[in-house]
Regions:
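Conserved N-terminal entry element of GNAT/NAT acetyltransferase domains
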Residues: 1-15, 19, 23, 30-36
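Conserved GNAT-fold acetyl-CoA-binding loop/helix
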Residues: 26-56
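A short helix-loop-beta-strand connector motif used in the catalytic cores of GNAT acetyltransferases and
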Residues: 48-69, 99
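Conserved beta-strand in the GNAT
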Residues: 70, 76-85, 104
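Conserved acetyl-CoA-binding loop-helix of GNAT-fold acetyltransferases
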Residues: 102-105, 111-124, 151
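Conserved active-site alpha-helix within GNAT-family acetyltransferase domains
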Residues: 116, 140-158
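Conserved GNAT acetyl-CoA-binding A-motif
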Residues: 126-137
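Conserved beta-strand-loop-alpha-helix junction that forms the acyl-donor binding cleft
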Residues: 135-145, 162-165
């Protein structure tokens, strides 16, 4: 797709990003809850989730240790990604990892390599910041995202399990 551009997010993008994030969360939750109703209680959002995401994204746009990217088609936002550098558990030799926290492309534009474009820019930024390893979390039931990340070379590292007490 020749008309795709990837750019760093700006503070003026925040309201638009909240809209993309809301669409992302609704679709994400529809996928994971439909396949596993036990997850429902774990993905219910607080009433002020939009405001929290706005503030979190704003802090990441301003941070030298984070990268927020916007994917545009003919100048219209169609997706975004967010990544940041996080400290690893102190006992391990790898001090820091790059964490890909969000990746969303509008459904109409999926399957066209746009997420790979976002990933490539994100990984280049991580390498520039001397980060040797990237990590991502994915719900077991989100098979599309799981397969994308596997195709990008991610491997299974840890499994988080939960139980109601």
């Amino acid at each position: 797709m020749d008309n795709i551009t990837i750019r760093k997010a700006k503070l003026k993008d925040l309201d638009m990003m909240v809209g993309l994030w809301n669409t992302f969360m609704k679709l994400h939750n529809d996928i994971v809850i439909k396949n596993n109703n036990k997850i429902r209680v774990h993905v219910l959002m607080k009433k002020n989730a939009d405001d929290m995401f706005y503030k979190w994204t704003k802090s990441n746009i301003r941070s030298k240790d984070a990268l927020v990217l916007i994917a545009e088609y003919d100048g219209v936002p169609i997706g975004y990604s967010m990544a940041y550098i996080k400290n690893n558990v102190r006992i391990y030799k790898i001090d820091k990892t790059g964490y890909l926290s969000d990746m969303y492309i509008k459904k109409k534009y999926q399957g066209k390599g746009i997420s790979s474009m976002l990933k490539d820019k994100t990984f280049a930024w991580m390498r520039k910041n001397n980060i040797a390893y990237a990590s991502v979390q994915v719900y077991d039931d989100n098979l599309h995202a799981y397969n994308v990340y596997k195709n990008w070379g991610f491997f299974e590292f840890i499994t988080e399990m939960r139980k109601k007490l």
